[in-house]
Amino acid sequence: MSKKYDAGVKEYRDTYWTPDYVPLDTDLLACFKCTGQEGVPKEEVAAAVAAESSTGTWSTVWSELLTDLDFYKGRCYRIEDVPGDKESFYAFIAYPLDLFEEGSITNVLTSLVGNVFGFKALRHLRLEDIRFPIAFIKCCAGPPNGIAVERDRMNKYGRPLLGCTIKPKLGLSGKNYGRVVYECLRGGLDFTKDDENINSQPFQRWQNRFEFVAEAIKLAEQETGERKGHYLNVTANTPEEMYERAEFAKELNQPIIMHDFITGGFTANTGLSKWCRKNGMLLHIHRAMHAVIDRHPKHGIHFRVLAKCLRLSGGDQLHTGTVVGKLEGDRQTTLGYIDQLRESFVPEDRSRGNFFDQDWGSMPGVFAVASGGIHVWHMPALVAIFGDDSVLQFGGGTHGHPWGSAAGAAANRVALEACVKARNAGREIEKESRDILMEAGKHSPELAIALETWKEIKFEFDTVDKLDVQ
């Protein structure tokens, strides 16, 4: 028996720290931000992460002789300092693709973050980024439809889509809920949506809501001549109930359903995405609970990882924050998410938080959704940041209009079309935002009132989770 298989305990770095290793194109690469306990060498901390997230255990075991450990083990091949942080460092780890079940995001996350975060040798650990090899991506179904198909289904081109969450999000009866949906859609929105925590409560059972929403959509389409939709939340207590709700939405001829992908889980989400593809249904994804996982700058999973995983698991729209609204997220970081959702190839760019080149092959893109504390004054910045392949959702910024939800929807539609027209004419819409909106307000009393109502409303808080750049 060779020395390395002698019984006992040995340091992780003897096996899992391999600074001379050159990653293969087929390797899954991960970047962890590590903060070790005082006195533990960086190489030992990084190697421990590589070991526990792949083949390692705390003791040398005889059964290692029954496999090729050198082939299957994760390898920490590089360590970098974190700019501006003397306590933490980046550990870059390569995993052979055979460690993971083909196309299973659940299995990837179970391996990479399932147990290692509880290590005593670590004070903090954060998964910053993953490079999925194209061989793994080809095993994932991805978005059930994608951006181009969704535009064709909804017959909407050349601009961002407009939506809003129904407010109050809890407490309305099914009939009154449908009434609010109708007001928003007839006013000019493309979509309305259930909020993340609307499922099937005593005040509003899901069948009742679905039926009244379907009626509201039909009336709004007849009145406006436009295709409309509402994100019907099918998230449920069991997969069987989830599919029952999805099937009922299909029976009502609805174009889109919704899922809370983190609370619902990646297994449920992947299954629902495949159902949507088979049944011609669009799938909106809410990220409820994400900040519990991604907001701490030293511990958890960065949202760019969750966004990548969602694109692979499947969804046609995903919330990404707004930059300018009430939710966390700076501009460069958010642009990094948007790139990962929509582009076919995303180069390494630390200024946007992307640690690796990411080739998405021919996988369809996902609409980026801006939602949370936005109103008409934000419209120029939103159009500039998110571009056309996005959904801009104004909840309070629609329903809070003094003349009601229909007027709020009309104000948002006029503001959007004014910004798109100005952009297409070559104007710098962020610099000229006030002039563009005030000019449009002269021809729209709904917009003029909205501009006056929201003129003092700002959310100027510093970002907690900032990019680690010099």
Swiss-Prot record:
Name listed for the protein in its UniProt record: Ribulose bisphosphate carboxylase large chain
Sites where the protein binds substrate: N115, T165, K169, R287, H319, S371
Chief localization: other
Transmembrane segments: none
Top EC class of this enzyme: lyase
GO biological process terms, semicolon-separated: photorespiration; reductive pentose-phosphate cycle
Note: The basic functional RuBisCO is composed of a large chain homodimer in a 'head-to-tail' conformation. In form I RuBisCO this homodimer is arranged in a barrel-like tetramer with the small subunits forming a tetrameric 'cap' on each end of the 'barrel'.
Location in or out of the cell: Carboxysome
InterPro entries per UniProt: RuBisCO, RuBisCo_large_chain_AS, RuBisCO_lsu_C, RuBisCO_lsu_C_sf, RuBisCO_lsu_fd_N, RuBisCO_lsu_N_sf, RuBisCO_lsuI
Keywords: Bacterial microcompartment, Calvin cycle, Carbon dioxide fixation, Carboxysome, Lyase, Magnesium, Metal-binding, Monooxygenase, Oxidoreductase, Photorespiration, Photosynthesis
Signal sequence, start to end: none
